[in-house]
Amino acid sequence: MEVSRRSVLIAAWLLSMTVPTAAQSPLFYPNQTSGPATTSTPGEPPQRQVSWKLLPSNVLHDQKQVWLFPASLAHGRHWAPTAGLVFATAGLVALDPHTAPYFRQTQTFNQFNRVLSFNNTLALMAAAPITAYAVGRVRHDSYSQQTAELAAEAVLSAEIPALVTRDVARRLSPGDIPPNGNFSATWFRSQKGPFYLGPGGFPSGHTVAAFSIATVFAERYRRRRWVPWTAYGLAGLVGFSRVTLQAHFPSDVFVGAVLGYTVTHYIVLRR
């Protein structure tokens, strides 16, 4: 019972930081110019600049919005979406001890796991922004280059709160638990050290990165209807692979997807 209460508190703490307001300005599209790309709409002054040189300052600006978001809850705003996500996460956490043993025992996903291994999914996630940037450089297309730069910013901005939360929760991965072990006693037990980047932890870092990148491409190329479906479909496969590989529980993946999407959609692409 105490473990369940801790799970809900952790989920509430994370989601209260990372469910930014939906009442944001519309998504801006950049002008096709040389130098640092700007984000604007016709007839409006530039809203921001994006470049590799500005990446650190942009990430710091994003972090300010992420970590100050709980202040909006104190003023009575955004309680409905935050509460909904907290309850959804708590429900998945309660189901984790029942779903994890199935993926430990089944051999159904052996081939799937070989294809979407740890290293292969990293390569898959890196391929899209690297390709976009390379094509943009060759074609002198600042929009394509900015897409890659925004993807890098989105991943960094979402992974920072994810890493902090992983260090606080210190959750074991399903693979750390013996086949007949207790899949409920997973919180505050990992001894993998601060800022650990490997398997395990709440939330899933792979899923955070996958949905951050997917959201950038899905929104910046949303007029091509196949792009959002492909981007989120591939991100979903990356997240699912973390479960089948026994690297994460389903709740880790769910919160990773929420975190990657919300930080990218409501903060990185909205200012």
Regions from the language model: what does each represent?
Residues M1-L9, N119-N120:
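Bacterial N-terminal signal peptides that target proteins for export
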Residues T18-N120, M125-R139, P174-G200, R271:
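N-terminal targeting leaders of membrane proteins
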Residues L9-T18:
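Bacterial N-terminal signal peptides
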Residues T82-V86, A90, A126-P129, A151, ...:
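Alpha-helical transmembrane spans of integral membrane proteins, capturing the lipid-embedded, hydrophobic core
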Residues P179-R271:
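Membrane-embedded catalytic cores of phosphoryl/pyrophosphoryl-handling enzymes
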Residues P81-T82, V135-P161, T165, P228:
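Interfacial segments of alpha-helical transmembrane regions
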